[in-house]
């Protein structure tokens, strides 16, 4: 058994397979995930687990050089927006329309991690960096 860090087998595997600029999407319980996509569904009930808790765990495992957010989060969910920015304060941030966000996720995500989050626009695309 691992001593620390992510113990979910699928997420640990995805994290280990991430290369520079690879992307994963961490999403709320209502996000439309394309058929055939690799998905780790952590959702149990609405609100659990929370998106921010999953992001905190991933932040400990991965180097994130950029995040992509739907620009609607700024006005529709400022509390979540601020929490995400605080967590990834050293990463570049791109904002796109929610419809564009879904397209980017569909074509560029190695995997989706579905949370129980049930607040508006609580979806993040994480782009992996390198430690050298």
UniProtKB/Swiss-Prot annotation:
The active site is at 20 (proton donor). One of its GO terms (biological process) is D-ribose catabolic process. One of its GO terms (cellular component) is cytosol. Pfam families: RbsD_FucU (PF05025). Belongs to the RbsD / FucU family. RbsD subfamily. Homodecamer. HAMAP family: D_rib_pyranase. This is D-ribose pyranase.
